[in-house]
Amino acid sequence: MKTLKTTFLFVFATLLLLGCESKSEEITSKEDYSKYLSLKDNKSLSFAHKEIDFWQKKYDAAPNQISYLSQLAANYSTLFEYTGDIKNLYKSEDLLTKSNEAYNYSRVSTVRSLARNYISQHRFKEALELANKALAIGEGKKETQKLLFDVQMELGNYPEAVKNLNAIRDMNSFDYLIRLAKWNDHKGDLETAITFMEKARDIAEKDDNKGLKIWSYSNLGDFYGHAGRIQESYVSFLKTLALDPNYSYALKGIAWIVFSKERNVNEANRIIDAIAATHNTPDFYLLKSQIAQFEGNKNEEMKNRNAYFSMMEKNNYGAMYNKYNALIYADDKQTAQKALEIAKIEVEHRPTADSHDLLAWAYLNVGENKKALEIAQNHVVGKSFEPKVQYHLAMIYKSNNLALKAKPIKEELLSSLYELGPNFEKKVNQL
Protein backbone atom coordinates (compact mmCIF):
# COMPACT_ATOMS: atom_id res chain seq x y z
CA MET A 1 0.00 0.00 0.00
CA LYS A 2 2.85 2.32 0.94
CA THR A 3 4.60 1.48 -2.35
CA LEU A 4 1.42 2.23 -4.30
CA LYS A 5 1.03 5.56 -2.50
CA THR A 6 4.66 6.47 -3.16
CA THR A 7 4.29 5.56 -6.84
CA PHE A 8 1.14 7.67 -7.10
CA LEU A 9 2.89 10.66 -5.52
CA PHE A 10 5.86 10.22 -7.85
CA VAL A 11 3.64 10.09 -10.95
CA PHE A 12 1.61 13.09 -9.72
CA ALA A 13 4.79 15.09 -9.08
CA THR A 14 6.15 14.15 -12.50
CA LEU A 15 2.95 15.23 -14.23
CA LEU A 16 2.98 18.47 -12.26
CA LEU A 17 6.57 19.10 -13.27
CA LEU A 18 5.85 18.35 -16.91
CA GLY A 19 2.86 20.66 -16.76
CA CYS A 20 5.05 23.45 -15.40
CA GLU A 21 7.69 22.84 -18.06
CA SER A 22 5.05 22.91 -20.79
CA LYS A 23 3.63 26.12 -19.39
CA SER A 24 7.09 27.77 -19.33
CA GLU A 25 7.24 27.36 -23.10
CA GLU A 26 4.27 29.70 -23.41
CA ILE A 27 5.69 33.15 -24.04
CA THR A 28 2.63 34.98 -25.30
CA SER A 29 -0.82 35.64 -23.91
CA LYS A 30 -3.85 36.51 -26.04
CA GLU A 31 -4.94 39.02 -23.40
CA ASP A 32 -1.78 41.04 -24.11
CA TYR A 33 -2.38 41.65 -27.80
CA SER A 34 -5.93 40.65 -28.85
CA LYS A 35 -7.12 44.25 -28.47
CA TYR A 36 -4.74 45.22 -31.30
CA LEU A 37 -6.29 42.70 -33.71
CA SER A 38 -9.71 44.31 -34.00
CA LEU A 39 -9.03 48.05 -34.03
CA LYS A 40 -11.67 50.07 -35.84
CA ASP A 41 -9.56 53.14 -36.50
CA ASN A 42 -5.98 54.18 -37.15
CA LYS A 43 -5.21 57.69 -35.91
CA SER A 44 -1.98 57.95 -37.90
CA LEU A 45 -3.77 56.90 -41.09
CA SER A 46 -6.70 59.26 -40.51
CA PHE A 47 -4.31 62.13 -39.81
CA ALA A 48 -2.32 61.39 -42.99
CA HIS A 49 -5.52 61.45 -45.08
CA LYS A 50 -6.52 64.79 -43.55
CA GLU A 51 -3.06 66.19 -44.19
CA ILE A 52 -3.15 65.05 -47.82
CA ASP A 53 -6.52 66.75 -48.28
CA PHE A 54 -5.21 69.94 -46.62
CA TRP A 55 -1.95 70.20 -48.57
CA GLN A 56 -3.52 69.17 -51.88
CA LYS A 57 -6.03 72.03 -51.59
CA LYS A 58 -3.25 74.47 -50.72
CA TYR A 59 -1.16 73.28 -53.67
CA ASP A 60 -4.11 73.44 -56.08
CA ALA A 61 -4.69 77.03 -54.99
CA ALA A 62 -0.99 77.94 -55.30
CA PRO A 63 0.88 75.57 -57.66
CA ASN A 64 4.00 77.73 -57.40
CA GLN A 65 4.45 76.64 -53.76
CA ILE A 66 6.69 73.66 -54.48
CA SER A 67 7.32 72.95 -50.77
CA TYR A 68 3.74 71.66 -50.51
CA LEU A 69 4.73 68.68 -52.66
CA SER A 70 7.14 67.41 -49.98
CA GLN A 71 4.36 67.64 -47.39
CA LEU A 72 2.11 65.56 -49.63
CA ALA A 73 4.89 63.05 -50.33
CA ALA A 74 5.59 62.52 -46.63
CA ASN A 75 1.94 61.74 -45.95
CA TYR A 76 1.68 59.31 -48.88
CA SER A 77 4.72 57.54 -47.39
CA THR A 78 2.77 57.25 -44.14
CA LEU A 79 -0.13 55.67 -46.05
CA PHE A 80 2.30 53.15 -47.54
CA GLU A 81 3.77 52.38 -44.12
CA TYR A 82 0.37 51.58 -42.60
CA THR A 83 -1.45 49.98 -45.54
CA GLY A 84 1.34 48.33 -47.53
CA ASP A 85 -0.30 49.66 -50.72
CA ILE A 86 2.59 50.11 -53.16
CA LYS A 87 0.67 52.77 -55.09
CA ASN A 88 1.20 55.16 -52.18
CA LEU A 89 4.97 54.67 -52.32
CA TYR A 90 4.94 55.41 -56.05
CA LYS A 91 2.72 58.46 -55.51
CA SER A 92 5.25 59.74 -52.99
CA GLU A 93 8.03 59.15 -55.54
CA ASP A 94 6.13 61.09 -58.23
CA LEU A 95 5.63 64.07 -55.90
CA LEU A 96 9.27 64.09 -54.79
CA THR A 97 10.49 63.80 -58.39
CA LYS A 98 8.28 66.73 -59.38
CA SER A 99 9.59 68.74 -56.45
CA ASN A 100 13.25 67.93 -57.21
CA GLU A 101 12.80 68.83 -60.86
CA ALA A 102 11.27 72.18 -59.90
CA TYR A 103 14.25 72.88 -57.63
CA ASN A 104 16.67 71.47 -60.24
CA TYR A 105 17.86 68.95 -57.62
CA SER A 106 19.38 71.75 -55.53
CA ARG A 107 17.41 71.30 -52.30
CA VAL A 108 19.27 68.72 -50.22
CA SER A 109 16.37 67.60 -47.98
CA THR A 110 14.17 66.87 -51.01
CA VAL A 111 16.98 64.99 -52.75
CA ARG A 112 17.52 62.86 -49.63
CA SER A 113 13.78 62.16 -49.34
CA LEU A 114 13.69 60.80 -52.88
CA ALA A 115 16.77 58.68 -52.15
CA ARG A 116 15.02 57.13 -49.14
CA ASN A 117 11.98 56.44 -51.31
CA TYR A 118 14.27 54.59 -53.74
CA ILE A 119 15.70 52.56 -50.85
CA SER A 120 12.16 51.43 -49.96
CA GLN A 121 11.77 50.33 -53.59
CA HIS A 122 15.14 48.49 -53.53
CA ARG A 123 16.49 50.88 -56.18
CA PHE A 124 19.76 51.17 -54.32
CA LYS A 125 22.08 52.34 -57.11
CA GLU A 126 19.74 55.21 -57.94
CA ALA A 127 19.53 56.03 -54.24
CA LEU A 128 23.34 56.19 -54.12
CA GLU A 129 23.43 58.62 -57.05
CA LEU A 130 21.02 60.92 -55.23
CA ALA A 131 22.93 60.59 -51.94
CA ASN A 132 26.14 61.63 -53.70
CA LYS A 133 24.26 64.51 -55.30
CA ALA A 134 23.13 65.61 -51.84
CA LEU A 135 26.71 65.34 -50.55
CA ALA A 136 27.94 67.54 -53.42
CA ILE A 137 25.43 70.24 -52.45
CA GLY A 138 27.18 70.30 -49.06
CA GLU A 139 24.32 71.41 -46.84
CA GLY A 140 23.42 69.15 -43.89
CA LYS A 141 26.44 66.94 -44.48
CA LYS A 142 25.98 64.65 -41.44
CA GLU A 143 22.40 63.80 -42.45
CA THR A 144 23.66 62.92 -45.92
CA GLN A 145 26.43 60.75 -44.44
CA LYS A 146 23.79 58.82 -42.48
CA LEU A 147 21.96 58.24 -45.76
CA LEU A 148 25.20 57.21 -47.46
CA PHE A 149 25.91 54.65 -44.73
CA ASP A 150 22.43 53.17 -45.18
CA VAL A 151 22.77 52.92 -48.97
CA GLN A 152 26.33 51.59 -48.93
CA MET A 153 25.29 48.85 -46.50
CA GLU A 154 22.49 47.81 -48.86
CA LEU A 155 24.94 47.72 -51.77
CA GLY A 156 27.65 45.84 -49.89
CA ASN A 157 30.14 48.71 -50.16
CA TYR A 158 31.30 48.15 -46.59
CA PRO A 159 34.58 50.17 -46.57
CA GLU A 160 32.62 53.22 -47.79
CA ALA A 161 29.86 52.52 -45.27
CA VAL A 162 32.38 52.50 -42.40
CA LYS A 163 33.89 55.80 -43.56
CA ASN A 164 30.48 57.42 -43.34
CA LEU A 165 29.77 55.75 -40.00
CA ASN A 166 33.01 57.11 -38.54
CA ALA A 167 32.22 60.57 -39.91
CA ILE A 168 29.04 60.79 -37.82
CA ARG A 169 30.53 59.25 -34.65
CA ASP A 170 28.70 60.48 -31.54
CA MET A 171 27.95 58.04 -28.72
CA ASN A 172 25.12 60.31 -27.55
CA SER A 173 23.38 60.27 -30.92
CA PHE A 174 20.42 57.94 -31.51
CA ASP A 175 21.07 57.94 -35.26
CA TYR A 176 24.72 56.98 -34.80
CA LEU A 177 24.02 54.22 -32.26
CA ILE A 178 21.37 52.47 -34.38
CA ARG A 179 23.80 52.43 -37.31
CA LEU A 180 26.61 51.18 -35.09
CA ALA A 181 24.23 48.41 -33.99
CA LYS A 182 23.51 47.55 -37.62
CA TRP A 183 27.22 47.43 -38.41
CA ASN A 184 27.94 45.03 -35.54
CA ASP A 185 24.99 42.86 -36.53
CA HIS A 186 26.42 42.71 -40.06
CA LYS A 187 29.77 41.57 -38.62
CA GLY A 188 28.00 38.78 -36.73
CA ASP A 189 28.46 40.37 -33.30
CA LEU A 190 24.82 40.30 -32.22
CA GLU A 191 25.57 40.84 -28.52
CA THR A 192 27.34 44.14 -29.22
CA ALA A 193 24.63 45.12 -31.69
CA ILE A 194 22.00 44.66 -28.98
CA THR A 195 24.06 46.72 -26.51
CA PHE A 196 24.17 49.68 -28.89
CA MET A 197 20.50 49.34 -29.80
CA GLU A 198 19.65 49.38 -26.09
CA LYS A 199 21.71 52.56 -25.67
CA ALA A 200 19.73 54.10 -28.54
CA ARG A 201 16.49 53.02 -26.85
CA ASP A 202 17.64 54.66 -23.61
CA ILE A 203 18.16 57.95 -25.46
CA ALA A 204 14.70 57.69 -27.04
CA GLU A 205 13.17 57.06 -23.62
CA LYS A 206 15.12 59.89 -21.97
CA ASP A 207 13.96 62.32 -24.67
CA ASP A 208 10.46 60.78 -24.57
CA ASN A 209 10.50 60.70 -28.37
CA LYS A 210 7.55 58.52 -29.38
CA GLY A 211 8.74 57.85 -32.94
CA LEU A 212 12.23 56.83 -31.83
CA LYS A 213 10.86 54.67 -29.02
CA ILE A 214 8.63 52.81 -31.49
CA TRP A 215 11.57 52.32 -33.84
CA SER A 216 13.98 51.10 -31.14
CA TYR A 217 11.45 48.81 -29.42
CA SER A 218 10.48 47.08 -32.68
CA ASN A 219 14.10 46.64 -33.75
CA LEU A 220 15.08 45.31 -30.34
CA GLY A 221 12.19 42.88 -30.71
CA ASP A 222 13.95 41.54 -33.80
CA PHE A 223 17.43 41.53 -32.26
CA TYR A 224 16.29 39.76 -29.09
CA GLY A 225 14.58 37.14 -31.24
CA HIS A 226 17.77 36.54 -33.23
CA ALA A 227 19.62 36.09 -29.93
CA GLY A 228 17.06 33.56 -28.66
CA ARG A 229 15.83 35.98 -25.99
CA ILE A 230 12.21 35.34 -26.91
CA GLN A 231 10.56 36.71 -23.76
CA GLU A 232 12.39 40.04 -24.18
CA SER A 233 11.49 40.04 -27.86
CA TYR A 234 7.82 39.64 -27.01
CA VAL A 235 7.91 42.41 -24.39
CA SER A 236 9.59 44.76 -26.88
CA PHE A 237 6.89 44.14 -29.47
CA LEU A 238 4.20 44.77 -26.84
CA LYS A 239 5.91 48.05 -25.90
CA THR A 240 5.81 49.03 -29.57
CA LEU A 241 2.09 48.31 -29.79
CA ALA A 242 1.37 50.21 -26.57
CA LEU A 243 2.73 53.32 -28.32
CA ASP A 244 1.30 52.58 -31.77
CA PRO A 245 -1.56 50.03 -31.69
CA ASN A 246 -1.57 49.89 -35.51
CA TYR A 247 2.10 48.99 -35.90
CA SER A 248 1.70 45.82 -37.93
CA TYR A 249 5.41 44.92 -37.90
CA ALA A 250 5.24 44.31 -34.13
CA LEU A 251 2.14 42.14 -34.53
CA LYS A 252 3.94 40.15 -37.20
CA GLY A 253 6.79 39.66 -34.72
CA ILE A 254 4.34 38.28 -32.17
CA ALA A 255 2.81 36.01 -34.82
CA TRP A 256 6.28 34.60 -35.45
CA ILE A 257 6.78 33.88 -31.74
CA VAL A 258 3.40 32.13 -31.60
CA PHE A 259 4.29 30.03 -34.66
CA SER A 260 8.01 29.35 -34.31
CA LYS A 261 8.38 29.13 -30.53
CA GLU A 262 4.94 28.01 -29.35
CA ARG A 263 3.93 26.10 -32.50
CA ASN A 264 0.37 27.40 -32.17
CA VAL A 265 -0.62 27.50 -35.84
CA ASN A 266 -4.26 28.49 -35.33
CA GLU A 267 -3.35 31.51 -33.23
CA ALA A 268 -0.53 32.52 -35.60
CA ASN A 269 -2.98 32.43 -38.51
CA ARG A 270 -5.50 34.47 -36.51
CA ILE A 271 -2.94 37.21 -35.93
CA ILE A 272 -1.76 37.22 -39.56
CA ASP A 273 -5.32 37.40 -40.91
CA ALA A 274 -6.04 40.35 -38.62
CA ILE A 275 -2.93 42.21 -39.82
CA ALA A 276 -3.59 41.47 -43.50
CA ALA A 277 -7.09 42.96 -43.22
CA THR A 278 -5.53 46.43 -42.96
CA HIS A 279 -1.92 45.97 -44.05
CA ASN A 280 -2.02 43.79 -47.13
CA THR A 281 1.39 42.78 -48.49
CA PRO A 282 2.49 39.60 -50.33
CA ASP A 283 4.80 38.35 -47.57
CA PHE A 284 1.85 37.50 -45.31
CA TYR A 285 0.79 34.84 -47.81
CA LEU A 286 4.26 33.33 -47.62
CA LEU A 287 4.08 33.20 -43.84
CA LYS A 288 0.70 31.45 -44.05
CA SER A 289 2.21 29.09 -46.62
CA GLN A 290 5.03 28.25 -44.17
CA ILE A 291 2.49 27.53 -41.44
CA ALA A 292 0.50 25.25 -43.77
CA GLN A 293 3.71 23.44 -44.73
CA PHE A 294 4.46 22.84 -41.04
CA GLU A 295 0.94 21.41 -40.61
CA GLY A 296 1.48 19.13 -43.62
CA ASN A 297 -1.42 20.80 -45.43
CA LYS A 298 -0.15 20.83 -49.02
CA ASN A 299 -3.35 22.32 -50.47
CA GLU A 300 -3.29 25.28 -48.09
CA GLU A 301 0.45 25.72 -48.63
CA MET A 302 0.04 25.98 -52.41
CA LYS A 303 -3.12 28.09 -52.12
CA ASN A 304 -1.22 30.74 -50.16
CA ARG A 305 1.83 30.53 -52.39
CA ASN A 306 -0.39 31.05 -55.44
CA ALA A 307 -2.08 33.99 -53.68
CA TYR A 308 1.39 35.48 -53.16
CA PHE A 309 2.25 35.24 -56.86
CA SER A 310 -1.21 36.51 -57.81
CA MET A 311 -0.63 39.61 -55.71
CA MET A 312 2.81 40.04 -57.29
CA GLU A 313 1.21 40.01 -60.74
CA LYS A 314 -1.50 42.53 -59.81
CA ASN A 315 0.98 45.02 -58.35
CA ASN A 316 4.30 46.30 -59.61
CA TYR A 317 6.69 45.68 -56.72
CA GLY A 318 9.81 46.08 -58.82
CA ALA A 319 12.77 44.37 -57.15
CA MET A 320 11.30 44.49 -53.64
CA TYR A 321 10.46 40.77 -53.49
CA ASN A 322 13.29 39.38 -55.63
CA LYS A 323 14.85 37.56 -52.66
CA TYR A 324 11.55 35.87 -51.75
CA ASN A 325 10.95 34.88 -55.37
CA ALA A 326 14.42 33.43 -55.83
CA LEU A 327 14.14 31.31 -52.68
CA ILE A 328 10.71 29.97 -53.68
CA TYR A 329 11.80 29.12 -57.23
CA ALA A 330 15.06 27.52 -56.04
CA ASP A 331 13.17 25.01 -53.89
CA ASP A 332 11.62 23.40 -56.97
CA LYS A 333 13.89 21.83 -59.58
CA GLN A 334 11.38 22.79 -62.30
CA THR A 335 11.68 26.50 -61.49
CA ALA A 336 15.28 26.60 -60.23
CA GLN A 337 16.43 28.19 -63.51
CA LYS A 338 14.11 31.14 -62.78
CA ALA A 339 15.77 31.48 -59.38
CA LEU A 340 19.15 31.63 -61.09
CA GLU A 341 18.02 34.43 -63.40
CA ILE A 342 16.66 36.48 -60.49
CA ALA A 343 19.77 35.87 -58.39
CA LYS A 344 22.00 37.15 -61.20
CA ILE A 345 19.93 40.35 -61.33
CA GLU A 346 20.19 40.74 -57.54
CA VAL A 347 23.98 40.37 -57.63
CA GLU A 348 24.10 43.01 -60.36
CA HIS A 349 21.86 45.37 -58.37
CA ARG A 350 23.45 44.81 -54.94
CA PRO A 351 26.55 42.57 -54.81
CA THR A 352 26.24 41.70 -51.10
CA ALA A 353 27.06 38.37 -49.47
CA ASP A 354 23.32 37.69 -49.21
CA SER A 355 22.83 38.25 -52.94
CA HIS A 356 25.76 35.97 -53.73
CA ASP A 357 24.22 33.40 -51.40
CA LEU A 358 21.06 33.48 -53.53
CA LEU A 359 23.22 32.94 -56.61
CA ALA A 360 25.16 30.06 -55.06
CA TRP A 361 21.92 28.46 -53.80
CA ALA A 362 20.34 28.75 -57.25
CA TYR A 363 23.38 27.15 -58.91
CA LEU A 364 23.22 24.30 -56.38
CA ASN A 365 19.58 23.70 -57.23
CA VAL A 366 20.21 23.58 -60.99
CA GLY A 367 22.87 20.93 -60.34
CA GLU A 368 26.02 23.05 -60.61
CA ASN A 369 27.52 22.08 -57.26
CA LYS A 370 31.07 23.20 -57.94
CA LYS A 371 29.96 26.60 -59.27
CA ALA A 372 27.87 27.04 -56.12
CA LEU A 373 30.89 26.21 -53.95
CA GLU A 374 33.15 28.62 -55.82
CA ILE A 375 30.71 31.53 -55.37
CA ALA A 376 30.11 30.66 -51.71
CA GLN A 377 33.82 30.48 -50.89
CA ASN A 378 34.62 33.74 -52.68
CA HIS A 379 31.64 35.87 -51.64
CA VAL A 380 29.72 34.33 -48.72
CA VAL A 381 31.99 32.55 -46.23
CA GLY A 382 32.75 34.85 -43.29
CA LYS A 383 30.70 37.67 -44.81
CA SER A 384 27.15 36.82 -43.78
CA PHE A 385 25.99 35.17 -40.58
CA GLU A 386 22.27 34.92 -41.33
CA PRO A 387 20.99 31.43 -40.39
CA LYS A 388 19.40 30.78 -43.81
CA VAL A 389 22.64 31.76 -45.53
CA GLN A 390 24.54 29.42 -43.21
CA TYR A 391 22.08 26.60 -43.97
CA HIS A 392 22.63 27.11 -47.71
CA LEU A 393 26.38 27.07 -47.10
CA ALA A 394 26.15 23.78 -45.20
CA MET A 395 24.10 22.24 -48.02
CA ILE A 396 26.64 23.43 -50.59
CA TYR A 397 29.48 21.87 -48.56
CA LYS A 398 27.52 18.63 -48.18
CA SER A 399 26.80 18.47 -51.92
CA ASN A 400 30.52 18.86 -52.61
CA ASN A 401 31.49 16.05 -50.21
CA LEU A 402 32.80 18.48 -47.60
CA ALA A 403 30.85 17.10 -44.65
CA LEU A 404 33.49 18.16 -42.12
CA LYS A 405 32.96 21.80 -43.10
CA ALA A 406 29.20 21.42 -42.78
CA LYS A 407 29.33 19.89 -39.27
CA PRO A 408 30.15 23.05 -37.23
CA ILE A 409 27.53 24.99 -39.21
CA LYS A 410 24.93 22.37 -38.32
CA GLU A 411 25.77 22.75 -34.62
CA GLU A 412 25.36 26.52 -34.89
CA LEU A 413 22.07 26.19 -36.79
CA LEU A 414 20.56 23.96 -34.11
CA SER A 415 20.68 27.00 -31.82
CA SER A 416 19.02 29.18 -34.51
CA LEU A 417 15.90 27.08 -35.13
CA TYR A 418 13.60 29.77 -33.70
CA GLU A 419 14.82 32.27 -36.28
CA LEU A 420 14.76 29.73 -39.11
CA GLY A 421 11.28 28.48 -38.26
CA PRO A 422 9.81 25.03 -37.56
CA ASN A 423 10.09 23.84 -41.17
CA PHE A 424 13.89 23.94 -40.92
CA GLU A 425 14.16 21.66 -37.89
CA LYS A 426 14.10 18.45 -39.93
CA LYS A 427 16.30 19.97 -42.66
CA VAL A 428 18.98 21.02 -40.18
CA ASN A 429 18.94 17.65 -38.41
CA GLN A 430 19.47 15.92 -41.77
CA LEU A 431 22.61 17.92 -42.59
Language model: regions and residue ranges:
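Generic helix N-cap/helix-start motif at coil->alpha-helix transitions
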Residues: 31-32, 66, 103-110, 137-145, ...
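N-terminal leader/linker segments that initiate helical-solenoid repeat arrays
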Residues: 20-109, 129, 162-163, 408-411, ...
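TPR-repeat structural position
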Residues: 45-48, 82, 89, 124, ...
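Residue-level recognition of tetratricopeptide repeat
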Residues: 74, 81, 116, 150, ...
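TPR/TPR-like (Sel1-like) alpha-helical repeat modules
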Residues: 169-173, 201-202, 276-282, 290-310, ...
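Structural motif corresponding to the intra-repeat A-B loop/turn of tetratricopeptide repeats
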Residues: 79, 83-86, 121, 155, ...
